[in-house]
């Protein structure tokens, strides 16, 4: 039935005032529920979400992927960071809403990818508020290989154009940046071959930025090195998926 419709089934069976949605690859800290309860007692909350982190037991590749998926430099802060280039949209790996909001929006659509962002957009379009609960974090297990990670992020790039077709106003500048990265890297590589090798400095400086930032956060040289690879994979895969979807739906007008 897909992730969205499966969540709908569970939500329709639930009897509480609030609904929580978590991915099956997430680990919930002991204080997670208490943090959410306290937030709901403090103020009226329609829908909310929290960030994701890497557990100390995760592999080096998973920690590196966690860096690339959460860093401001690779995502613009849209995945639960306080500093962000886009309004916060709760995502279903760590998301909650009142039963009233769920029933009003009729839950998740049967989309293969991006169904959680679609629901968050519809929640806000209906006039409800969403908020980030920074302390309501989960430990999110990442893909175990870079190959699987590439496929995941490529699908996310494709999904962003599908979301644009449903919600034209949802496409922001930050969503174009991975495509700009892909085109920029190709230009630098071509220029280094035909003009001057110094054009590779731009790519090298970006790699150095990812390395030093990950080293600062993870305190591990191996994770920092893998974070550079993960970050380049993420930006490339998302950018290619985004460009591919633009070509399919914008130029070829596929349905």
Predicted feature residues:
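Short aromatic/hydrophobic "clamp" motif used to bind/position activated sugar donors
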Residues: 19
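A recurrent flexible, glycine/aromatic-enriched loop bordering the glycosyltransferase active site
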Residues: 54, 77-100, 112, 118, ...
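Membrane-embedded multi-pass helical conduit in multi-pass membrane proteins
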Residues: 181-252
């Amino acid at each position: 039935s897909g992730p969205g419709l499966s969540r709908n089934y569970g939500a329709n069976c639930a009897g509480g005032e609030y609904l929580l949605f978590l991915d099956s690859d997430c680990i919930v800290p002991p204080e997670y529920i208490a943090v959410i309860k306290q937030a709901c007692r403090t103020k009226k909350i329609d829908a909310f979400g929290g960030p994701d982190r890497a557990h100390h037991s995760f592999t080096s590749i998973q920690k590196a992927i966690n860096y690339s998926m959460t860093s401001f430099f690779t995502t613009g802060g849209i995945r639960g960071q306080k500093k962000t280039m886009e309004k916060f949209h709760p995502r279903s790996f760590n998301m909650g809403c009142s039963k009233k909001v769920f029933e009003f929006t009729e839950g998740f659509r049967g989309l293969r990818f991006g169904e959680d962002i679609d629901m968050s957009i519809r929640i806000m379009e209906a006039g409800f508020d969403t908020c980030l609960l920074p302390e309501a974090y989960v430990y999110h297990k990442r893909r175990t290989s870079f190959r699987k990670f590439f496929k995941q992020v490529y699908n996310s790039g494709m999904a962003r154009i599908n979301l644009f077709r449903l919600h034209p106003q949802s496409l922001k500048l930050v969503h174009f940046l991975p495509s700009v990265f892909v085109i920029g890297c190709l230009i630098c590589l071509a220029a280094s071959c035909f003009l001057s090798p110094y054009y590779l400095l731009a790519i090298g400086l970006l790699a150095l930025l990812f390395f030093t930032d990950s080293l600062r956060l993870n305190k591990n040289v191996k994770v920092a090195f893998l974070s550079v690879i993960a970050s380049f994979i993420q930006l490339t895969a998302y950018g290619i998926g985004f460009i591919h979807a633009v070509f399919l739906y914008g130029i070829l007008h596929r349905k």
